[in-house]
UniProtKB/Swiss-Prot annotation:
<feature type="compositionally biased region" description="Polar residues">
    <location>
        <begin position="538"/>
        <end position="551"/>
    </location>
</feature>
<keyword id="KW-0333">Golgi apparatus</keyword>
<keyword id="KW-0597">Phosphoprotein</keyword>
<keyword id="KW-0479">Metal-binding</keyword>
<dbReference type="InterPro" id="IPR017907">
    <property type="entry name" value="Znf_RING_CS"/>
</dbReference>
<dbReference type="GO" id="GO:0051865">
    <property type="term" value="P:protein autoubiquitination"/>
</dbReference>
<keyword id="KW-0677">Repeat</keyword>
<feature type="modified residue" description="Phosphoserine">
    <location>
        <position position="741"/>
    </location>
</feature>
<keyword id="KW-0832">Ubl conjugation</keyword>
<dbReference type="GO" id="GO:0001764">
    <property type="term" value="P:neuron migration"/>
</dbReference>
<dbReference type="InterPro" id="IPR036028">
    <property type="entry name" value="SH3-like_dom_sf"/>
</dbReference>
<keyword id="KW-0862">Zinc</keyword>
<keyword id="KW-0808">Transferase</keyword>
<dbReference type="GO" id="GO:0046330">
    <property type="term" value="P:positive regulation of JNK cascade"/>
</dbReference>
<dbReference type="Pfam" id="PF00018">
    <property type="entry name" value="SH3_1"/>
</dbReference>
<dbReference type="InterPro" id="IPR050384">
    <property type="entry name" value="Endophilin_SH3RF"/>
</dbReference>
<feature type="domain" description="SH3 2">
    <location>
        <begin position="196"/>
        <end position="259"/>
    </location>
</feature>
Amino acid sequence: MDESALLDLLECPVCLERLDASAKVLPCQHTFCKRCLLGIVGSRNELRCPECRTLVGSGVDELPSNILLVRLLDGIKQRPWKPGPGGGGGTTCTNTLRAQGSTVVNCGSKDLQSSQCGQQPRVQAWSPPVRGIPQLPCAKALYNYEGKEPGDLKFSKGDIIILRRQVDENWYHGEVSGVHGFFPTNFVQIIKPLPQPPPQCKALYDFEVKDKEADKDCLPFAKDDVLTVIRRVDENWAEGMLADKIGIFPISYVEFNSAAKQLIEWDKPPVPGVDTAECPSATAQSTSASKHPDTKKNTRKRHSFTSLTMANKSSQGSQNRHSMEISPPVLISSSNPTAAARISELSGLSCSAPSQVHISTTGLIVTPPPSSPVTTGPAFTFPSDVPYQAALGSMNPPLPPPPLLAATVLASTPSGATAAVAAAAAAAAAAGMGPRPVMGSSEQIAHLRPQTRPSVYVAIYPYTPRKEDELELRKGEMFLVFERCQDGWYKGTSMHTSKIGVFPGNYVAPVTRAVTNASQAKVSMSTAGQASRGVTMVSPSTAGGPTQKPQGNGVAGNPSVVPTAVVSAAHIQTSPQAKVLLHMSGQMTVNQARNAVRTVAAHSQERPTAAVTPIQVQNAACLGPASVGLPHHSLASQPLPPMAGPAAHGAAVSISRTNAPMACAAGASLASPNMTSAMLETEPSGRTVTILPGLPTSPESAASACGNSSAGKPDKDSKKEKKGLLKLLSGASTKRKPRVSPPASPTLDVELGAGEAPLQGAVGPELPLGGSHGRVGSCPTDGDGPVAAGTAALAQDAFHRKTSSLDSAVPIAPPPRQACSSLGPVMNEARPVVCERHRVVVSYPPQSEAELELKEGDIVFVHKKREDGWFKGTLQRNGKTGLFPGSFVENI
């Protein structure tokens, strides 16, 4: 080995100065210079090994010297050496090391190349001027260089060039005889290189240690402090020095300069493999995830802040020290640690606008474990400040359009006031466009989402990867798509394993929803069935009709007369107008109401729609329109239109709660054998949600939305169809007890308090098979206004009311709403997910794109707790979903 290279290895790991004979070896066999050890004792009143943190009981002077180091230094001092090929003058000298100073006494020209590590070439002061080698960083020209462009430095062979700065690895900026310019590196030989900047880093956030006794190894600092980097401890921690203190600090809290980056990369521990389900850091994820897809990583090195007991510290070596071994609970806080730069490296992920949601603008599609069948649970919605409107031209349709389907959309305003708006074909016809084509039940479902937003997809076919960067697809597995390539391949990550890669786009189907105006807007729809039998499409219209005068506190309800456009495979005709009452609470202004209607009309082409298989029903009859009322205010009764046919039916829905003035809306009655009943449900938060079964009826086939049969014996086929439809539409019969939602959780299900008044009346239309039983509900009031008795009377004339049923006072849970996409064969029925509200007690910067950025005081909805102490949840502030350490939050 060359002598200069050997000297470079003999340096103190702390100060990086050349070791001399006074260096001391610790009991752990690590060697440091005496000056550094004395500095550690003086600053911390104890001596711990900077490498492995082993406590040293004896004093610095009592420590033994490193015998091997002393022998190496003696051998180098006594050994004469020959000048290298680049030496000048052919002089031979010995490189003598002084015992204390480690300085060079005599040196040849080759020594000048290796003098960057702390030695001072004293021979320069005595050199004759004819050599022309300055003491500044310099290089010797090996060839003539004339320069090819203005600004280049011209020199001749043998010239000594003073180095000013290094532009890149191939070019320098230097000076010859007072002339400055650029020259290529391969034309010169570096005699004395430019001084390397010290490895330093700048603090991006405050790093504080609350328990100084338990975390005395940590190096606290404030924002904008400049630290000297000593070495990298492990994947997430580095060792540094601030003033006279030495300790470890998290890498994500600082920004390194070029020298420190090289040091950090050089000291990077080897990673045998990466388990991407454990969410490694962004650097390891981009390189190792594709190379080692099947290998496992030590789960204890998963993250810096995973709490472990301090008992593990003593057994860890210098290379096996795990970054998470600080102390339970985690006691690290920061001023405002955000890792937006790391997350934004993935194309399509934006961290600037808080309204942009990680998975879906209006909420999270809850995914089950991989072993369970894929279901679409209730979506958790969080308020958004910025309305998101899907752009029609920003998506790539994967398949050609199949039959036309439609759905009724209910939009809500950003202020929280509710407005039931029927939307679809009429607005599209007014704009000169036809209804939006949608995929069938077994095909991919077209969705409207810009490419810059990540979307959730479900694998509909298995796929085995053929290259390193490809992902394995398992049927039913959820994926978050970041980018859709032009060749039909998608780039995304698995929501089960967190692996990132590419996969064919025709092997997956979209799951997320396109939204209407704000994140509170909800679209209810039913599972795709036989689309060819016809689907009713309802949209707002400006045609004249009875208007409801403002009443009470100025609540104005202007019912829009809605024409019903029916798309059929054969003989279904467009029915006459239907009346839909629109109620707005006093919190809703006129401008907000107009904006809600405009949004629905403008985006009527962007609604996810689906069809429901019609069910054959005998002796179906028509119900009149239900009256709509507001508690504590007078009710407006609407005249009953004439019965249109034996196959048309309607529904009256009423939901009331004590001491809560809420708008009760009712379904429309359509004077045609073909109609659709809409159930409008009002949540306690003031938002209104439409449930549209979308059941086309005819004299031969009439739809039954939900309910239980009380008379007649249907055949097996009809019974099976009804049973399947009930599961798809409601997930439970009307006799099911109400499910209590978590308190204050903004879910899509109607939350029923235990001490509140039960629901009165039916929650939906009931049309039993083989009979003519029906139920009519009314909006109960407190006696302030008349009740629309005409509707009930006429309804009782047509049907006899069921006795001993649940009509009177037993609370009935509304049917769980479906997600806004039809998964076809992979979706069974909605499954509720219990989530807990947690508050962030300590801010947490994410270490990878799969983790959440937590700020102190944030509210997180936790819906999965893992065995390793990590939680999976959704951040209420921006709706993003990801992983975070459980010790950073507390249950509330």
